[in-house]
Amino acid sequence: MAKIAIMGFGTVGSGVLEVCRRNAASIARRAGEPVEVKYILDVRDFSGSPDAALFTKSIDTILNDPEIKVVVETIGGTKFAYPYVRRCLESGRSVCTSNKEMVATYGAELLALAKEHSAAFLFEASVGGGTPIITPMHQCLAANHISSIRGIVNGTTNFMLTKMKRENMGFDAALKIAQQLGYAETKDPGDDVDGRDACRKVAILASLACGHHVYPDNIPTRGIRDITVADIKAAEKLDSAIKLIAWYNEGGDGQMAAGVEPMLVSNSNQLAGVDDVFNAVLMKGDMLGDVVFYGKGAGKLPTASAVVADVIDALKEGVKVHDSLFWKPAEKPEGLLEDRNTYPWYLRVTGVAAALLPSVAGAGHVVFEDNGEAAYLVDAATSADIAAVTEKIEVLGGKVALAMKKLED
């Protein structure tokens, strides 16, 4: 029998215990032996729980027990999770986690540490929740060079944008509903609505795609706070939908770029039809072409099931999994990764008449003009071009309230 420990007994951690018990027979069959949770590490008081005997407040209880082969980390954040995971790996125990912040920040270091101590460090649930993405990337797509990733990887903002579109609802109202349903944090929803959650996820995917660590701090990141009902309606007029897109590109010259930002997505693009809390990631491989991963990106049991699947892999494969699941450490570059590609751009401008926009922004057409605001679709421009346009509009006494790339097929 394989004995495991869970660190952190919140939503996902409690889900791991539930999955291990509800599907014990099938897990044992796939792992080659029964899997039992022996310890749960949590500083809170669970003395009234039916599982009170499993709880400990000290990681040393886990590390001093030679029966524990795999540790599940669902604490979240990095303050406690990172040093605890390091200690587990250094002791030769495999670690399975759903912690995207830790993987995005310390992934290369922890992967190397796992290899050094003949352990596994697995994190399928960190990007897609219950939707498999990491394992298909390093196994099924191993013969491909991944040059492009486009994804909707945050279910909360996708739910909000869907609400705004279907019900002509503003950002604040959509956020309130997302909070009431438990999709967004009540105290600070910034990780979701400001794009930080999506940034961490695309940093992990980019690291796996290019083979070296991509730091979240180097990825330009914007959220959806500036999106208005007028923008949603303008998108419909342009046969498009507004989505928060996390993306990665590798050019023919090997130059890499990545970002998280709201985009106009043409209705002919598969991502435009991904609504509510669903996520989708579109990847381009040099041999396979396009492949799409689609499913719910969060939820207690879907995410926990992905963590338990990693536990099975850790028990069966151990350090061998890192023959393909690995990326190298890299020096952290200065500044942000720069996107030099050309796109159509949607601009919503205040304080400047629509008639002036062609001469200021270049070739394109007016989408709407109303109550001192105008929207203009630029035919083709780079990010640097749009920065220059923004300066020109400010000289004229106006302001670019929103600038979005248009993602075609």
What residues fall within each predicted segment?
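A conserved regulatory-domain signal marking ACT and ACT-like small-molecule sensing domains
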Residues: 311-409
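Rossmann-fold NAD(P)-binding glycine/threonine-rich loop
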Residues: 81-87, 91, 98-138
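Conserved active-site and cofactor/substrate-binding residues in soluble primary-metabolism enzymes
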Residues: 7, 11, 15, 35, ...
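Rossmann-like NAD(P)H-binding beta-loop-alpha module
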Residues: 68, 115-197
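N-terminal glycine-/serine-/threonine-rich beta1-alpha1-beta2 phosphate-ribose binding loop
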Residues: 1-91
